[in-house]
Amino acid sequence: LLMTGVESGRDAYIAKNYNCVYHCFRDDYCNGLCTENGADSGYCYLAGKYGNACWCINLPDDKPIRIPGKCHRR
């Protein structure tokens, strides 16, 4: 079955370059960041696996997410 024009999304930590999360303290910051990148919404996940970081709901597949491994800062 081939479906065209259908976009899928995932719930995940949105990532910067080098596999790093966006740290946060406020939900409105993350909601803005996530929706600007095509997600339905977002919030600041407090004390999560990567500390306080932005979590997006239904983030498009073409946007980077945090994957296992280190954050490689420049």
UniProtKB/Swiss-Prot annotation:
Record bears the keyword Lipid metabolism: no
Xref: Pfam families: Toxin_3 (PF00537)
Localization per Swiss-Prot or TrEMBL: Secreted
Signal peptide: 1-8
Keywords: Disulfide bond, Ion channel impairing toxin, Neurotoxin, Secreted, Signal, Toxin, Voltage-gated sodium channel impairing toxin
Protein family (similarity comment): Belongs to the long (4 C-C) scorpion toxin superfamily. Sodium channel inhibitor family. Alpha subfamily.
Physiological role: Alpha toxins bind voltage-independently at site-3 of sodium channels (Nav) and inhibit the inactivation of the activated channels, thereby blocking neuronal transmission.
Identification of the protein by name: Toxin BmKaTx17
